[in-house]
């Protein structure tokens, strides 16, 4: 796996037309953040901001995962979503 494949997956996810569940969106987001920034480095948002809190928790669950592992998982998840869309 390399940076080019990751960048291609980042572009491909923007082209998806089919429905993607909120849970899948959170997973993809969390692996993207881990791959590009590493461990979550921002304070937890207030519990009243449900969307931001969910995104923070999803990213924070990947703590300790290497950027390369996160890239691999991100690429695999995007491929899975593309296959599901194709039927």
UniProtKB/Swiss-Prot annotation:
One of its GO terms (biological process) is fatty acid metabolic process. GO terms for cellular component: cytoplasm. It is found in: Cytoplasm. PROSITE patterns: ACB_1 (PS00880), ACB_2 (PS51228). An acyl-CoA binds at residues 29-33, 55, 74. InterPro entries: Acyl-CoA-binding_prot_CS (IPR022408), Acyl-CoA-binding_protein (IPR000582), Acyl-CoA-binding_sf (IPR035984), FERM/acyl-CoA-bd_prot_sf (IPR014352). GO terms for molecular function: fatty-acyl-CoA binding. Keywords: Cytoplasm, Lipid-binding, Transport. Belongs to the ACBP family. May be involved in the energy metabolism of the mature sperm. This is Diazepam-binding inhibitor-like 5. It comes from Bos taurus.
